[in-house]
Regions:
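N-terminal Rossmann-fold cofactor-binding loop
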Residues: 49-53
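Conserved Rossmann-fold NAD(P)-dependent oxidoreductase catalytic core, especially the SDR/UDP-sugar
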Residues: 99-155
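A generic structural signal for short, solvent-exposed coil/turn residues
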Residues: 14-16, 38, 56
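N-terminal twin-arginine translocation
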Residues: 1-16
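N-terminal Rossmann NAD(P)H-binding glycine-rich loop of SDR-like oxidoreductase domains
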Residues: 21-42
């Protein structure tokens, strides 16, 4: 998979000054493969955590932990593991962020939540910008409360 333009390839080839251990929740869908390739090109160690259903043959040399955020004990594969950075991609349900934050708060230095799904109300419009209407799955006060809880769980 070639995710980089020619101009970007030069940047991608530069090694990071300090290699990091990066956990990517998801990693094989829409944006994850680009993150994985970039991190690997910089010399980082990448671990994927997902259900193993979407593009499971991608990245054969990357460690893959299997887990399901929809079931009790779905994060068990992460127990006892430490990471410098966690990138959380496949969030469709707010409690997933809360639960992941609670599981990982003592074992990671940085937790990055990336929302790539259903952020905007219209899926029909081409050229959506930050000024367009956001899609709220809950009324605004509930979203505010959930955001506060998520920040607290993540430490």
């Amino acid at each position: 998979m070639n995710t980089s333009s020619n101009a970007q390839q030069h940047i991608d080839q530069q090694r990071a000054p300090k290699p990091l251990s990066i956990l990517i929740l998801g990693g094989t869908g829409f944006i994850g493969p680009h993150q994985v390739e970039y991190a690997l090109s910089r010399g980082h160690t990448v671990t994927l955590f997902n259900r193993g259903r979407t593009n499971p043959s991608l990245f054969p040399k990357v460690e893959k932990l299997i887990g399901d955020r929809n079931v009790p004990n779905g994060y068990d594969a992460l127990k006892g593991r430490k990471f410098d950075v966690v990138i959380d991609n496949p969030v469709q349900i707010p409690r997933w962020v809360t639960e992941a934050g609670a599981v990982l708060k003592d074992t990671t230095n940085r937790y990055m939540f990336v929302s790539t799904l259903s952020a905007y109300a219209s899926r029909q419009k081409i050229g959506i910008t930050e000024a367009d209407e956001a899609l709220l799955s809950e009324p605004a006060p509930v979203n505010d409360l959930l955001a506060t809880r998520i920040r607290g769980a993540a430490g």
